[in-house]
Amino acid sequence: MKTLKLLSSSLLICFLLSSCGTSFYDQYSFTETLETKANALSLVEVSDQEYQQHKVAAQALINKIDMMVSYEKAKSKNEITIQMWQYLQSDASSIQQFLDLWETQGTLS
């Protein structure tokens, strides 16, 4: 009886501890986050040129952010990262506002 009680207690503790964890480290997410940052900074660097020359790269950045939102939603225990990507996807984010301003004005100095 003691063995059964000990076993059930151990299983309960293991279950509780495993349910409190966070998402595992994901090399793909890390790499894509760094690449997205580099792409955004590259666009900032060339924003003194006509937007139309870099429209494809700007759209690729938006598509990458959209893809990362979908990718992160597919992982469990990942709410904070999902919120981060969703913010970057929203019109309130500085990157979206930057791209809109650049497109509207043509060039930024």
Regions inferred by a protein language model and the residue ranges of each:
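Bacterial signal peptide processing site
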Residues: 21-23
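Post-signal peptide N-terminal segment of mature Sec-exported envelope proteins
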Residues: 25-50, 57
